[in-house]
Amino acid sequence: MNILHSTLSTWRDRLAPVSRTSTFRTTGQITPEEFVLAGDYLVYKFPSWSWADASSPAKRVSYLPPGKQFLVTRGVPCHRRLNENFAGDAGHEDEIVRDMLAGDDGDGWLRTGGGRDLAEGHADRTGDVRTVDEAGNIGEREEGDDEEEEEIPDMEDEDDDEEAIIREPAGTSSTTQPIRTYNLYITYSNFYRTPRLYLSGYLSPSEPLPPHLMMEDIVGDYKDKTVTLEDFPWFDGGVKMATVHPCRHASVMKTLLDRADAALKIRRDKLKQAHSPAEASRISAERGLEGLVDETRGLSLGEQQQQGGGGSGGDEWEVLQHDEEDQVAIRVDQYLVVFLKFIASVTPGIEHDFTMGV
């Protein structure tokens, strides 16, 4: 079934009419020219990514230039397997990113991360709370007052205590072993007019990971639905890879673009209401694109200022300070960076940010 689907998908992309009209802001889709522009930006900002050509001229697509048929980064580490507990939490408590339009529960993208465990952990941390008055005096516990406070043992007393050593029970398998690496490929889907991600895993530099084992690194709700095993269309010989189907990419990207623009508008409004240069400076230094991604550490997505350099936002998203009403939070050349941030929810064990290290 996957072979038939892969063949149909390849021919559908090659035979679909090529769009030359930009609808980036209104649909979340991009043209082949915009894909090349976004790819050039990704390669420039993050040299671990590079352009690559098809394995033979017959495998090239006509709407992309030779030598820029797809993007690739190699040796991305994957330190953990996604067990059934992780997948179960993803199915129960995770948030679905919607495009704000009417539709069924499938019209969106699942934001993963073990929401139930995080919520329970948060409840555990907040259940035993003490208050502190203005003088710095610590009050009694809000809950559990009748429980005696445990004595904190001296670590030096535990150095030779065999019972204090935590050992992993025999026969149990850790979700952090063995370490795998992945080659990631970003292609352009001409039918859906969005990027598409392919993954090829390795147990060692010389030992490819069998395709069915790649599914161990995919969130359970996506296996055989959003993620399937298909031949990579740009290689001869039928190289099987895991691929994230692009049918929802445009709507999710549109949602993220809208959120980023809304966050930029909020920041502009705050700057207008600032009462002092110091307050304006503090607002400008705040993290941009609120609600787009939960973490952006390690990324440097904004171009450096041409004059004057510096600024605390150098490792964050660039938000220009001049107050232009038509200014957007994310340019089309930054498209693939945002794409990689949301696609990471499918494979949270793979360190996508590793490919963006500066």
Curated annotation (Swiss-Prot):
Positions of region (Disordered): 112-161
Localization (cell): Cytoplasm
Region Handle region: start-end pairs: 251-334
GO molecular function (one): Atg8-family ligase activity
Principal location class: cytoplasm
One Pfam family named in its UniProt record: Autophagy_act_C
GO biological process, one term: glycophagy
GO cellular component: cytosol; mitochondrion; phagophore; phagophore assembly site
Active site: 247 (glycyl thioester intermediate)
Annotated Acidic residues bias: 142-161
Biased composition (Basic and acidic residues): 117-133
Subunit: Monomer. Interacts with atg8 through an intermediate thioester bond through the C-terminal Gly of atg8. Also interacts with the 40 amino acid C-terminal region of the E1-like atg7 enzyme. Also interacts with the atg12-atg5 conjugate.
Known role: E2 conjugating enzyme required for the cytoplasm to vacuole transport (Cvt) and autophagy. Required for selective autophagic degradation of the nucleus (nucleophagy) as well as for mitophagy which contributes to regulate mitochondrial quantity and quality by eliminating the mitochondria to a basal level to fulfill cellular energy requirements and preventing excess ROS production. Responsible for the E2-like covalent binding of phosphatidylethanolamine to the C-terminal Gly of atg8.
Name of the protein in its database record: Autophagy-related protein 3
Source organism: Aspergillus clavatus (strain ATCC 1007 / CBS 513.65 / DSM 816 / NCTC 3887 / NRRL 1 / QM 1276 / 107)
